[in-house]
């Protein structure tokens, strides 16, 4: 996956604003309509506990940030493409936000905001997020894949199953934007503030 996304960024020299704004105008309302009520309730719980909440995703920052803000979240941590004079250069700026890259990204955020990751929450449905889940004090798996569910059971992590929509449907609908994060309650990190 990393190689495919990096190749996509490296072969892209496109103006950023118009194309992404147009894409976001089409995609975000659709995504918002597909977010599970349980995921919204989890976000509300963290908000009422005065915690900052972030989507942490391999998707481009320019897509996950507006989605997070539309959900009333603090922000998003996504993969950032380097931009020069309003055009993508084809290089990454910062870590590829996948696997260990997510750990690097949340550790950086924790340093900036003086947060203790042992007091933070992370939610995921994918075993690819085991590094991120292992880096926080409160990992929660949501509609997990088989490997993640086995790991969670062995380690005593909470397992949450959302009803109605299956993981397969969520992944198919959101795969193009890599935001299963919010729809399945995954890749959301709730961080204690103050």
Segments and roles (model prediction):
Residues 11-19, 175:
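Membrane-proximal helical "anchor" segments flanking the first transmembrane region
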Residues 21-23, 29-194:
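C-terminal cap/substrate-recognition subdomain and adjoining C-terminal extension
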Residues 1-12:
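Single conserved hydrophobic/aromatic residue that forms the stacking wall/gate
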């Amino acid at each position: 996956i990393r190689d495919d996304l990096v190749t996509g960024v490296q072969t892209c020299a496109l103006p950023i604003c118009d194309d992404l704004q147009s894409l976001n105008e089409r995609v975000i309302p659709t995504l918002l309509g597909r977010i599970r009520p349980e995921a919204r309730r989890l976000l509300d719980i963290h908000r009422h506990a005065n915690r900052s909440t972030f989507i942490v995703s391999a998707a481009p920052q320019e897509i996950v940030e507006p989605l997070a803000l539309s959900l009333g979240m603090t922000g998003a941590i996504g993969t950032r493409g380097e931009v020069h004079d309003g055009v993508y250069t084809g290089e990454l700026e910062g870590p590829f936000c996948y696997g260990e890259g997510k750990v690097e990204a949340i550790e950086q955020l924790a340093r900036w905001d003086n947060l203790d990751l042992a007091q933070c929450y992370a939610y995921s449905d994918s075993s690819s997020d085991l590094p991120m889940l292992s880096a926080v004090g409160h990992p929660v798996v949501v509609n997990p894949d088989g490997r993640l569910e086995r790991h969670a059971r062995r380690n005593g992590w909470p397992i949450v199953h959302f009803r109605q929509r299956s993981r397969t449907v969520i992944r198919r609908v959101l795969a193009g934007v890599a935001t299963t994060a919010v729809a399945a309650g995954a890749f959301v990190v709730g961080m204690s503030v103050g």
